[in-house]
């Protein structure tokens, strides 16, 4: 199983466009419903910082087959002031965070 957090900061004029691209990823995920995969995206209160939390039981991750994710990734560097940084994590404890 792999788990990671990806964090980046968009340019202020690109934050809403980024959020729309993220919503398109979730729309496709809700249609295709890949198993063994959990994903959430957070927009922080500064409105330009985004955090993605990914947990996948499969390798490669099913997110790589999502067309909307490819479209999201295609222009990510151009939308960002701070590029995405991915960090692998190990869960210490959780209350219903990855279930349900």
Functional labels for PLM-detected ranges:
Residues 2-9, 37-70, 100:
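Short, well-ordered beta-strand segments in beta-rich or mixed alpha/beta enzyme
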Residues 9-20:
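Short, surface-exposed ligand-recognition loops at beta-strand->loop->(often short) alpha-helix junctions
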Residues 14-16, 60-62, 94:
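Residue-level signal for secondary-structure boundary sites
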Residues 23-25, 44, 98:
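Residue-level signature of transmembrane alpha-helix interfaces in integral membrane proteins
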Residues 24, 28-38, 54-89:
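An amphipathic, aromatic/His-enriched active-site/gating alpha helix that lines ligand/cofactor pockets
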Residues 43-45, 88-92:
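A general secondary-structure junction signal
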Residues 92-100:
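Short, low-order "capping/linker" segments at domain edges
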